[in-house]
A protein has these predicted regions:
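Ubiquitin-like/PB1-type beta-grasp interaction modules and other compact soluble beta-rich domains
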Residues: 48-49, 61
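A short, sequence-level motif marking secondary-structure junctions
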Residues: 16-23, 54-57, 63-64
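Compositionally biased, low-complexity segments enriched in small residues
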Residues: 10, 28-32, 52
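A short, charged, amphipathic alpha-helix used as a generic interaction element across diverse proteins
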Residues: 16-36, 40
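Short aromatic-glycine-(Arg/Gly/Cys) micro-motifs in beta-strand/loop hairpins
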Residues: 1-11, 42-45, 53-57
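A subset of signal/propeptide-processing and intrinsically disordered low-complexity segments
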Residues: 36, 47-48
Length: 64
């Protein structure tokens, strides 16, 4: 299964594994608001995870 990370106002990136996707998503969050990083640890494989900060959002989800 491929995992997509979408950053609002930016392009999507596709990853081969959930760990790669979360590593990338974590970097995006660290650059903006490190306090919500704990939420990524709750992501389960196959589920949508999305976090909003300011006028931007980060979504991590499986590719259909």
């Amino acid at each position: 299964m491929k995992i997509i990370v979408h950053i609002q106002g930016n392009s999507e990136k596709t990853f081969a594994s959930i760990n790669e996707a979360l590593s990338f998503a974590r970097l995006q969050v660290y650059a903006t608001q490190a306090t919500i990083i704990r939420a990524f640890d709750a992501l389960q494989d196959g589920n949508l995870a999305q976090w909003n900060y300011g006028f931007t959002s980060v979504a991590v989800y499986p590719q259909n």
